[in-house]
Amino acid sequence: MSHLRSVAAKLKPYCTGLLVKHNSILRTLPPRCYVYSSGAKEPFLSGTNSSYVEEMYYAWLENPKSVHKSWDAFFRSADNGTPQCEIQGVPSLADIESKLPSLSSQGLATAPAKAEKIVEEHLAVQSLIRAYQIRGHHVAQLDPLGILDADLDSFVPSDLITTLDKLGFYGLHEGDLDKVFRLPTTTYIGGTDSTLSLREIIRRLENSYCQHIGLEFMFINDVEQCQWIRQKFETPGIMKFINEEKRTLLARLIRSTRFEDFLARKWSSEKRFGLEGCEVMIPALKAIIDKSSEMGLEYVILGMPHRGRLNVLANVIRKDLDQIFCQFDPKLEASDEGSGDVKYHLGMYHERINRATNKKITLSLVANPSHLEAVDPVVQGKTKAEQFYRGDTEGNKVMSILVHGDAAFAGQGVVYETFHLSDLPSYTTNGTIHIVVNNQIGFTTDPRMARSSPYPTDVARVVNAPIFHVNADDPEAVMYVCSVAAEWRNTFNKDVVVDLVCYRRSGHNEMDEPMFTQPLMYKQIHKQVPVLKKYADKMIAEGTVTLQEFEEEIAKYDRICEEAYARSKDKKILNIKHWLDSPWPGFFTLDGEPKSMTCPPTGIPEDMLSHIGAIASSVPLKDFKIHGGLSRILKSRLEMTNSRTVDWALAEYMTFGSLLKEGIHVRLSGQDVERGTFSHRHHVLHDQEVDRWTCVPMNHLWPNQAPYTVCNSSLSEYGVLGFELGFAMASPNALVLWEAQFGDFYNTAQCIIDQFISSGQAKWVRHNGIVLLLPHGMEGMGPEHSSARPERFLQMSNDDSDAYPEFTQDFDVSQLFDCNWIVVNCSNPASYFHVLRRQILLPFRKPLIIFTPKSLLRHPEAKSSFDDMKTGTNFQRVIPENGAASHSPQEVKRVIFCTGKVYYELVKERHRKGLDSQVAITRLEQISPFPFDLVKQEAEKYATSELVWCQEEHKNMGYYDYVKARFLTILNHARPVWYVGRDPAAAPATGNKNTHHVELRRFLDIAFDLEYFEGKPF
């Protein structure tokens, strides 16, 4: 296009001169009505004429003989770079004048009128073609039921383009139907022909855009991509299938349909969320996988809701049918610990040979909850990880497919969040194929009440993804669209949406009565001939298959199902681990158990600490200009390293750096994590003079180290946390961390935490080692910048408050193995260092929730020595009192147990009041699972002392409800554990700074009032 503009620029002086001369002639004529565009001074360069020149140039590029010889000569000269003054082949003004008719009013009027007529007709045809390309989908025959227009737009007339009376809008009329027009280069309807009659143009456009396929793509701002789609759908005869392809399609439809029929016969009263009404989805998915495998793809990761899931497991993933049928037997108990999940939520991982390509293909269907679309970012994160570990930077080996329902695709915000990750460098999966099962109803809700946009797929427009709507009762159209979708993704590495417009033969589930709310729709559905019968009749009529062959194929699959059903009756137990969607080969034993129940020391050699500290204090790149304030930070780090101390940021640096040396990939993601919300991290340095020149010193630590990824995320919690969870699913040998900007904001991702992180292992036997960093602390910053809601995480912890555990030699590790997640609140950098390293050195994986500090990041007392981090040291679940009070425990009047930042306020207040020998302060670094053994030791050490739990959070929040019950279990309810902290409240914190300090002063006074609880009932 840029070259065309340069050619047009060379034409500009000639056109301008011609216009001036032409206008002077017109002044002698009788008055007429002329309408000029804003670009009248440049008739060939703007408005309609510029389009004409553009078409002429494109036509000349394709075939120089298709244009007049004068244009051929002109374009040849201009294309060769000939100076404008030397261009040959364009007549001079004098030549033009000599060829004009005599200056009679009739002659002067008819010549330009004839030329204008030719241009106008050409542009009219071009506009008509463009109208079909832009709006043809509005009148496509998409609804199998013939009830609704799929787009729901009542303002779009059904005869938008398709009737003859509409031709006048484009400047054409019925008399032009047999007139032959040259086709523009923006269409492929001509095939090998460059001209067609208007009647044939309309017929071919109707076939391409207004039948069972509706295309939305003209909003894409890329000419190459638009041309690619036009070529795929406009070229005559391009959608033809050979007989072998049709037979394969029919066989797949048989399997899809008969599987649902078999389940309906055997378990008529069971919920299974069948696929009836959209049976074509199974052949559709298989067509995508076949085409992608043909183009070199090795791994497909799928995410989908419950509808049709069992069918996908059986006929796409190829899960053994007997194992699927076992899930319907209520008498079978699971051999695995945990709750398990309903059959239509389960996932699966399978490696097999793709029969269509004879290539190995790996398929993974990710387990998910009933929370619709929640699995979308999880699938994308897992896909990104699998691409990362394979070095698949272009997405040629690993791909994701997401299946959606129409109501959820339009209604759930996480869909939008996930789409907006698609082109971000650290989150892109190089294109996802989205399949929308558009059954035109959401449970009982009419789509006209469920969305404000014409289509459920309109959200995909935000990333310029082409949208292919297709009538699901036309299997061949569906197969072709899916094949094109796979090619699009492979060619452009961008998302694409296939909207399967279908219906739901039953209610929301098999027990539901849909006639209550959709009587007319379901009257039509009851009359609807199933797609298998429709297509089989068509194939038999064509002679592609015989009736006998069709019936034999049905009998063959029915026999397979019956044999599998018989085998399922021999099963004695269920194995949930057979449904694992993300296995870690070699990490566990063959039985899925940890190879040991021990954890090695988490400390590292001092020379390694010093080396990492030196790199963290420097800029590895030459001539890299950093900010002056950052220079001071790096200088401070070097001073700490030389003095063998670390603050929070340096301890984190040493954690990550040591793991990278051991070959462990570290990925830190979240809002503003590169610098850190509190400007403490600075893992990405920015040159102050060269735009976008950055340096990540962490990637310059060691030769052959693992890569370090630190990436600022979009302003999303739900989508991004789901993505990082999926990334952590792919491998146990990576430390994947998500940091909230403030801990308060994590709850917009509550669904991921509740449905996946907290309960994922119990439901799906799926380990995950994701780390959540949640900045937390009451610092007078108001109710939305104070609390990460630790009470919520503790309430979901599964350790029993009333069960006194047996203390074995490996109690600390086995306790971690039995819990659903680990909750810690570190009070010093060394604890943070050790707990992160322990996360990788454990022989299993559990989610780790860390309440990280804000003010402690720069607190002069919140530092650790190399001695606390060097070889042989470990994470301390409990840090006991080690001051004066610990030397004479019998004289200690009160023991204050606490966690996190409040420790430093307590120590300061104790010293101010001179109570160092009378009050002991013990810190719980690990809250859950509760360190029963170490807390018991402390309670026994101070057997006669008063026990207090002190927290800065309000009484109905924080840790008190969790720890109180466990303290009483340890103490056998023989001693009280008093509460010191803020009073109960609805909001997490006050918005008034003065009130904050009054509350702090009050509970600190109570904490060290040794007579406060005397005579009070517990």
UniProtKB/Swiss-Prot annotation:
Q: Which residues bind thiamine diphosphate?
A: R307, D406, N439, I441, Q671
Protein name listed in UniProt: 2-oxoglutarate dehydrogenase-like, mitochondrial
The Swiss-Prot or TrEMBL record describes its family as follows:
Belongs to the alpha-ketoglutarate dehydrogenase family.
Superkingdom field: Eukaryota
Which EC class, in a word? oxidoreductase
Name a GO CC annotation attached to this entry: oxoglutarate dehydrogenase complex
Q: Which InterPro entries match?
A: 2-oxogl_dehyd_N (IPR032106), 2oxoglutarate_DH_E1 (IPR011603), DH_E1 (IPR001017), KGD_C_sf (IPR042179), ODO-1/KGD_C (IPR031717), THDP-binding (IPR029061), Transketolase-like_Pyr-bd (IPR005475)
Q: Where does Mg(2+) bind?
A: D406, N439, I441
Q: Which GO terms describe its molecular function?
A: metal ion binding; oxoglutarate dehydrogenase (succinyl-transferring) activity; thiamine pyrophosphate binding
Keywords annotated in UniProt: Calcium, Glycolysis, Magnesium, Metal-binding, Mitochondrion, Oxidoreductase, Thiamine pyrophosphate, Transit peptide
Question: Which residues participate in Ca(2+) binding?
Answer: H138, D151, D153
Q: Any idea where this protein resides?
A: Mitochondrion matrix
Q: Biological process GO annotation list?
A: 2-oxoglutarate metabolic process; glycolytic process; tricarboxylic acid cycle
EC code(s) of this entry: 1.2.4.2
Q: Could you describe the subunit structure of this protein?
A: The OGDHC complex comprises multiple copies of three catalytic enzyme components, the 2-oxoglutarate dehydrogenase (OGDH/E1), the dihydrolipoamide dehydrogenase (DLST/E2) and the dihydrolipoamide dehydrogenase (DLD/E3). OGDHL/E1-like isoenzyme may replace OGDH in the OGDHC complex in the brain.
List cofactor names only: thiamine diphosphate; Mg(2+)
The record, for CDD domains, names: TPP_E1_OGDC_like (cd02016)
Q: Which reaction does it catalyse?
A: N(6)-[(R)-lipoyl]-L-lysyl-[protein] + 2-oxoglutarate + H(+) = N(6)-[(R)-S(8)-succinyldihydrolipoyl]-L-lysyl-[protein] + CO2
Role summary: 2-oxoglutarate dehydrogenase (E1-like) component of the 2-oxoglutarate dehydrogenase multienzyme complex (OGDHC) which mediates the decarboxylation of alpha-ketoglutarate in the tricarboxylic acid cycle. The OGDHC complex catalyzes the overall conversion of 2-oxoglutarate to succinyl-CoA and CO(2) while reducing NAD(+) to NADH. The OGDHC complex is mainly active in the mitochondrion. Involved in the inhibition of cell proliferation and in apoptosis.
The answer on whether this UniProt entry bears the keyword Glycoprotein reads no
Q: Does the keyword Chaperone apply?
A: no
